[in-house]
Amino acid sequence: MVEDSFLTDTQIKVLKLRKKGLTQEEIAKMLGTSRANISMIEKRAKENIKKAYNTIKIYNRIMAPLSIEIEEGTDVLEIPDIVFKKADEEGIKVKYNTLELIELIKENASEFIEKRTVKKKFKIYILENGDLDVGGS
């Protein structure tokens, strides 16, 4: 049933049942195992998902045609103009407008920002499809 995935058939089944609202105890009874075993299966599934996500993130950063280092002291409100200018120079249309970009930065780079100022430099990766990835230097 599993095509090519980091998840086992059992992990997929457990995640689907949990999404439907079943408890670990209910799933354990259905599958003829212990609640502790279901807990471990679910935990390992989530770990595998996180590793897969991080692998894709690393790959995207390697393949990104453009990365911009946002320097310490930069006003957050200046960042969209920096990003749009660099993307335009490379012929890449960014998928975000100014407000969406500021929100993305706020969500993904909050540890680098204090009030409206960058306190520690970070990078913004611009992917070929116009998507962005925000992360450490």
From Swiss-Prot:
Lineage top rank: taxon: Archaea
SUPFAM superfamilies given in the database record: DNA-binding protein Tfx
Gene Ontology terms, MF aspect: DNA binding; DNA-binding transcription factor activity
Swiss-Prot/TrEMBL keywords: DNA-binding, Transcription, Transcription regulation
Pfam families membership: Sigma70_r4, TFX_C
GO biological process: DNA-templated transcription initiation
Membrane-traversing stretches: none
Disulfide pattern: none
InterPro entries membership: Cro/C1-type_HTH, RNA_pol_sigma70_r4, Tfx_C, Tfx_DNA-bd_arc, Tfx_DNA-bd_euryarc, Tfx_DNA-bd_sf_arc
Similarity remark: Belongs to the Tfx family.
Known function: Putative transcriptional regulator.
HAMAP family: HTH_type_Tfx
Protein name: Putative transcriptional regulatory protein MJ0173
UniProt organism field: Methanocaldococcus jannaschii (strain ATCC 43067 / DSM 2661 / JAL-1 / JCM 10045 / NBRC 100440)
